[in-house]
Amino acid sequence: MTWGFGDCQYRVVESWGKGPEGRRLGIVSSIATDAQDRVYVIDREPNPAIVVFDRDGRLLDVWDQDFLKVPHSIWIGPDDRVLITDCQTHLVYEFPLAGTVVQTWGTRDEPGAPGKPFNQPTWAVFAPWGDLYVADGYGQNWMHRFSADGDLLNSWGGTGSEPGQFDTPHCVKIDPRERVLVIDRGNQRIQVFDKAGALLDVWSDVLSGNELVIDANDIIHLAEAENRVSLLDLDRMVLGRWGEKGDAPGQFVEALHGAWMDSHEDFYICEVPFTPNRLQKFESIR
């Protein structure tokens, strides 16, 4: 059976990451791949760790990091720098692929004041021009921008539904036009900003989005909590949707939370909040 829409067609790889050499996962909240297409999964609960697989689902490594409490998101850049947000410690960590922290942002175990970093940060990315963008989405509704040297440049947002305000800014990504895309989950929209945080556009017609990835053809794949993936172009047009509720391979039991696409355009999805081991690989067949 195939899944997808239009030219974006996939075949689910059953039991990926669950073989005899694999590790039984708990609640998985986020996923990313490196330049070699190794797959890094946040195993959030009950024992926080970063679990590493090869692209065929064979276990390679486990980063059992005592300082991780409630890791929420993982992002890996083209230079293989790794960013992880931790909601409980109010920190953003930067790793190399070796798994040793090289830098942190925030103050451990101290939530930031309103409008200040961080209070349960949800997502972080480096932009191609070097700035760091952090969605501070669970404890407050702000976006923060840092220089490549780690200096806070500016913050924007605040709680509300007006353009530029947020209700759970859950994920941030940079698109090929160098725009900052923020999934404003509670307001069921994507807000588009320039590099400095000036509002450019507001995209509605989404359902509780959690993460987005952009493929080589500039198609946005938006993982939504309502058991579906929406496909959009960079001009906000909805191209199609796919997804089906259920527990069979290829179906979705819970809220789609983490998504990533590797260099082969294979698509990875993980689900939260209550079903363990909900990680699926969809192999591209287009």
PLM feature segments, named:
Residues 1-286:
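Eukaryotic scaffold repeat domains enriched in small/polar residues
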